[in-house]
Design a protein with these regions (language model features):
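Flexible "arm" and connector segments at domain edges
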Residues: 1-111
Length: 111
């Protein structure tokens, strides 16, 4: 389980990402836009998880362990980098949930 301090930092990162998204693009203009953006971020998150090929890398590391070979740091680095990309995409998903939760921007012509 991840430590509480780390959880707080992840939440802080999501809030910072939300703030950056609002500063750059404003609030969502409609539930349709909010849904589309959230869907895109979820798809990107899933792509990163699948692209990481974690199982293949873990299998290669396990093969090294079973045959008493030196651990290949490049494999560990690749797992780390892929996990980092996944974490970043997860933060973006969280941020879009927060952004949508803050409401939809009211248009001047709407009541």
């Amino acid at each position: 389980m991840i430590c509480e301090v780390c959880k707080e930092r992840i939440e802080h990162a999501a809030k910072n990402e939300r703030d950056a998204a609002i500063a750059q693009h404003g609030k969502f203009h409609s539930p349709h836009e909010a849904w589309a953006v959230l869907k895109e971020e979820v798809e990107e998150m899933c792509q990163e998880v699948n692209r990481g090929a974690f199982q293949g890398l873990l299998y290669m590391l396990w093969n090294d362990v079973k045959h008493d070979k030196k651990t290949d740091q490049a494999k560990l680095d690749e797992i780390y980098e892929n996990a980092f990309k996944c974490a970043c995409e997860c933060v973006q998903v969280m941020a879009m949930c927060l952004k949508w939760g803050e409401g939809i921007e009211k248009r001047p012509d709407s009541v």
